[in-house]
Amino acid sequence: MMALGEPYYSSKPDKDFNFGSTMARRQMTPTMVTKLPKFVRNSPQAYDWIVRGLIFPTTGKTYFQRVVVITGGLEDGTYGSYAFNGSEWVEIYPIEHLNLMSSLKLIHKANALQERLRLSQEEKATLALDVQFLQHENVRLKELIPKPEPRKIQMKWIIVGAVLTFLSLIPGGYAQSQTNNTIFTDMIAACKYSTETLTENLDLRIKLALANITINDKLDAVRQILNFAFVPRAHWLRTVFYYIHYYEMWNIFMFVLAIGTVMRSARPGTDLITLATSHLSGFRMAVLPTIPFHTTMTLWVMNTLMVCYYFDNLLAITMAILAPILGIIFLCFMEDSNYVSQIRGLIATAVLIAGGHACLTLTGTTTSLFVVILTCRFIRMATVFIGTRFEIRDANGKVVATVPTRIKNVAFDFFQKLKQSGVRVGVNDFVVIKPGALCIIDTPEGKGTGFFSGNDIVTAAHVVGNNTFVSVCYEGLVYEAKVRYMPEKDIAFITCPGDLHPTARLKLSKNPDYSCVTVMAYVNEDLVVSTATAMVHGNTLSYAVRTQDGMSGAPVCDKYGRVLAVHQTNTGYTGGAVIIDPADFHPVKAPSQVELLKEEIERLKAQLNSAAENPVTVVTQQPIVTLEQKSVSDSDVVDLVRTAMEREMKVLRDEINGILAPFLQKKKGKTKHGRGRVRRNLRKGVKLLTEEEYRELLEKGLDRETFLDLIDRIIGERSGYPDYDDEDYYDEDDDGWGMVGDDVEFDYTEVINFDQAKPTPAPRTTKPKPCPEPKIEAQPLDLSQKKEKQPEHEQQVAKPTKPQKIEPQPYSQTYGKAPIWESYDFDWDEDDAKFILPAPHRLTKADEIVLGSKIVKLRTIIETAIKTQNYSALPEAVFELDKAAYEAGLEGFLQRVKSKNKAPKNYKGPQKTKGPKTTTH
């Protein structure tokens, strides 16, 4: 016997986890360690010590020799198992170790995060280097930018400005000639002014006393106010007005514009020339409101016409009137926007020249034209003020000013604010919040808020989406959690992980009060709290809360901190929530079809009993309606099925109880509820419906297979099947290797056929054949069994009642008759292809282990045949599968279909054979 060494561990995590068998680790040799597959570095592996015959086709004594099997995660991201055949590691079907798979998943996630961290650090370093390069480049480019030089004003424009200033200082028409005044003339003027003032005051007081004030008196009063008659004669304002009286308003305005143009204008030449031509032509103030309508070309046209007006006014008027007409004709080649701008400037020039000449001729000044143009501009601006404010942008589109369209009520603004604020009449209550009961739900689609309630984490259903597992972030740690249940409402219940222990949990409100609600949520990993008054709308709430992304799924609580609803709506201002009830936490288990049928049978029995007690004597002859004349609904078909089931239920109960008596006994160690148990002849001798009733059901639309499946389900429930099919149990990875574990009993006498050449067994001593017992029980499948010798008294009592079968092949036990090719050589169609193989979750463990590869091959052939509608290869494939099943001691699939759907009346099912036991767990 070889001496065993110390257990082998590939890394410290492997030693810490220590998955699998220690004995298998002791069997590791340096050669085996050298040839190990490329598992993930610093990851655990599971070691199993399994009988060689369960893995490799083996005969003789080597069948019971054990080999080392290593299971772990490979560097390419796959999960696999490898067995050592003496010279090298051979990949076999993966053995499931749940703890190992969970550990590998966490290690893979940690490695992925480390890789992401490494890439992020590299990217950060690269970006930091790029920032440094950009900073250096920025400094270099700043040095290349020419520094702005101080603005230089050309001397010619200074001269033009000085000329305009000189022109503006020339006295206007109000200048008076200087007279020689003496003391006597001043006294006479003062006495005259006093006498006139006294007379005017007396007349005004008399009119006021008699209430005889006319409109002319009111106009004279306004005129005196405008002439500053209320200012005393010795006041300093009189002195200022005395000197300003020598100059007109245009002179002062032109002086200010000339100084400002020389100092700040970007185009001083054009602006100064425009001021000069306005002054020389006499249009003066009337020119300024028309400047926004002009382009560069039309502005020079206006200046030219004003200079021409100074020399020949009639020629200037004629050219101004013809300018728009000529512009419409000769400028039509321009773009629409430029074309309209040019024509608008020419029209403004014509209006200015013609209107200015008319005003100068009639009134001697252009003030009236200035007022008219200014009024038109105000009207134009008022018509386009639609919104509450308008923005003024520069040439680059940047907003430089914002002007409100309505004047702010400055005088009464204080009273309005006082009215809106009101006077405090109460005190707000405190509300209870529990930040420790909140968490963040993270999914690939986004983030949301969740809260702990009971053993669940509650959030909004649209946060979870179609994900089965989500990430729960709580106090800086991330946990993986499974979505337990989602009702019809926008609510999702997530199972709280076992290693997550929240510091607080929220309870549901027994007496909901929606007058004041509190919303707690995480926004950008910051806790936000808001209170508002809610309104109830059926099963939803609405409240005025400024909602942000990430608040979905947050709890809506009352002032005591009890949950009322789950936040779900995000409109930016108005928040909404769906009310949560205690009934929402647990799914309503829908009654099974069998229970519904039983209830309906009891109801029909009660109706029959009541009908028997009160028989109806009057019978109305109804006309016979044929099937073509009658419209049959689904409810009529269901009622017919229920009536038939009521009549046959009593017979089914008695016979099923008699047949399934052995199966109803609970055996020690059986925890799978009879899953995979072989059941035969459960409907033997039972006549469910008459031929006429059966045909009537088919004509009314009921499928024969549906009806038989319903009966099979009832039988399966009574014989130990669960009420439902556990879809999670029959996953695509469950290929029979799930039984390999620490709590599984192995039968090392089992031989698995992998379609390899059968070896010739060693010579054996002939043993007496066991006689069949009077009562035969169905036993689990085993391909080989060491039969024990029965006592002599039992052999004498048991007498064979049937002829003995032919001796089976070595290490094999057949089932029924061998398949014949003539039984498979017929025209196959799509229905035959679909129903030849059962569903994957209805296959037994023996089918999956022995015939797994052939079943997968046949399914591929069936799918190809259905797609191409070519079923020529199907008979041979089914024949090969049934032949392999026969050699392995299993029932053929064609025989199963016949025994289920097409058995003759005298058909007694497949022949019973005793097989060795196998232990499944």
Swiss-Prot record:
Biased segments, Low complexity type: 908-921
Protein family (similarity comment): Belongs to the astroviridae polyprotein 1A family.
GO cellular component: host cell membrane; membrane
Highest taxon listed in the record's lineage: Viruses
Pfam family membership, one: Astro_VPg
Name of the protein: Non-structural polyprotein 1A
Transmembrane annotation, as ranges: 240-260, 287-307, 314-334, 345-365
Active site, renumbered: 462, 490, 552
Site positions (Cleavage): 176-177, 420-421, 665-666, 756-757
Amino acid composition bias (Basic and acidic residues), ranges on this chain: 784-796
Post-translational modification: Cleaved by the viral and host proteases. The protease is probably autocatalytically cleaved.
Catalyzed reactions: RNA(n) + a ribonucleoside 5'-triphosphate = RNA(n+1) + diphosphate
Region (Disordered) location: 753-813, 900-921
Gene Ontology terms, MF aspect: 5'-3' RNA polymerase activity; serine-type endopeptidase activity; serine-type exopeptidase activity
Disulfide bridge partners, by residue number: none
EC number, as in UniProt: 3.4.21.-
One GO term (biological process): viral translational frameshifting
Keywords noted in UniProt: Covalent protein-RNA linkage, Host membrane, Hydrolase, Membrane, Phosphoprotein, Protease, Serine protease, Transmembrane, Transmembrane helix, Viral RNA replication
Residues bearing the modification O-(5'-phospho-RNA)-tyrosine: 694
